[in-house]
A protein has these predicted regions:
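Active-site pocket-lining/capping segments in soluble small-molecule metabolic enzymes
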Residues: 165-190, 238-292, 297, 328-334
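Active-site beta-loop-alpha junctions enriched in small/polar residues
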Residues: 63-66, 93-97, 124-130, 155-157, ...
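Glycine-rich, positively charged N-terminal anion/phosphate-binding segment
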Residues: 43-49, 72-81, 85, 98-119
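Glycine-biased, low-complexity coil/linker segments
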Residues: 11, 25-26
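N-terminal amphipathic alpha-helix/helix-capping segment at the start of soluble metabolic enzymes
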Residues: 38-61, 68, 274, 333-334
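Glycine-rich, proline-tolerant flexible connector loops at the mouths of alpha/beta enzymes
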Residues: 66, 87-107, 155-165, 216-229, ...
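Active-site mouth loops of central-metabolism enzymes
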Residues: 58-74, 121-133, 186-202, 279-293
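Conserved, mostly hydrophobic/aromatic
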Residues: 62, 90, 142, 210, ...
């Protein structure tokens, strides 16, 4: 999910939380104290694309760096909860604007996931506000930290971070990364079309460029109508896009946040969901349960249709992620 959409849902842009690795273990630490990881050789080497085609539906999660006002240890609380659902990998977002400073926190959290939780991590790498030199430096750091997978994104434009000119589009970033290191490279896709694309045909044509540049796996923007995703898959396959495509799912937990997100990110609300919001929107507990049930229903239908994978936008809420994961655990393995 883009930082714009995340901001619409949490009301703040994720900020940098770690400076470098200089503490031995997790626990309560004063703000600003730094973290050190044991970056010994891992027992596995895993590219995200290798997870697919093995007889089960891939199930992954997204997290974001905690807000500046949150305690440093809050990321551990999220990850402690997510490890129990055994995701196939966890992606880590960036902050609005995609500045190199915010991408640095993405790198550090991805390293925590890889080296402390032993779960494959996929770091978001953006280029809208970065030079080739800055991207190269970030990639070198990721490789040094044992992070082998990246999600290559243009990133959201932000007036606080004037755009650089080294990369015009995400396909250029994909090609650049593939030439510079043995990374698994994934890309984003939009079942209802990128907000800046003039039409769906052009959008799929641009997505094909991204895959031809070297993207080995795609993660979709969130959507609420599975038929939109199925039509998108058909367009992709007809265009010759054969890489695995994960369906991005976000549970509806807050009426105001979802309405802001829809206005900013372009996802549409089907009639079934608008009825749900109208009925339960003023009752937070009821909406939470109804929203989780809606997400479970979406995921069950997608798995039954044989989708490659499910990417759950957790919004750093491991309890909701676990409730959803537990509900679909058996059908994922069939």
């Amino acid at each position: 999910m883009s930082a714009r959409c995340a901001k619409a849902l949490i009301g703040a842009v994720p900020q940098r939380i770690f400076g470098s690795f200089l503490c031995e273990q997790k626990g309560t630490r004063p703000r600003g104290e730094r973290i050190k990881m044991n970056l010994g050789k891992k027992a596995y080497l895993m590219k995200i694309a290798e997870l697919f085609g093995k007889g089960k539906t891939v199930f992954s999660c997204e997290v974001f760096p905690p807000k500046k006002t949150s305690p440093v240890d809050s990321i551990y609380k999220t990850l402690d909860g997510l490890k129990d659902i055994k995701p196939d990998f966890i992606s880590v977002t960036y902050g609005a604007g995609g500045s190199s400073a915010v991408n640095q926190s993405t790198r550090e959290i991805a390293a925590i996931i890889e080296n402390q939780y032993h779960i494959p991590a996929m770091a978001h790498v953006t280029c809208v506000a970065c030079t080739k030199g800055e991207v190269t430096e970030l990639l070198s750091g990721l490789k040094q930290d044992g992070v082998e997978n990246v999600l290559a994104l243009r990133g959201d434009r932000n007036p606080n971070f004037p755009p650089k000119t080294d990369f015009a589009h995400a396909d250029e970033l994909v090609a650049f990364i593939r030439r510079r290191g043995d990374f698994g490279v994934s890309g984003a896709c939009y079942p209802e079309g990128h907000p800046e694309s003039p039409d769906l045909v052009t959008d799929v044509r641009n997505l094909k460029k991204k895959v031809d540049a070297g993207a080995q796996h795609l993660v979709s923007q969130l959507f609420f109508d599975n038929d939109d995703f199925f039509r998108f898959l058909d367009r992709c396959r007809l265009a010759g896009i054969e890489v695995p495509i994960e369906a991005g799912i976000m549970p509806v937990l807050n009426k105001g946040s979802i309405e802001r997100m829809v206005s900013m990110c372009g996802a549409s609300l089907p009639r079934k969901l608008t009825r749900l919001l109208a009925r339960y929107g003023d009752h937070p507990e009821a909406l939470r349960e109804a929203g989780i049930a809606y997400a479970i229903d979406q995921i069950s239908d997608l798995i039954a249709a044989g989708v490659d994978g499910i990417h759950l936008y957790t919004m750093n809420n491991p309890q909701v992620a676990k409730q959803i994961s537990d509900s679909v655990a058996s059908i994922r393995r069939v």
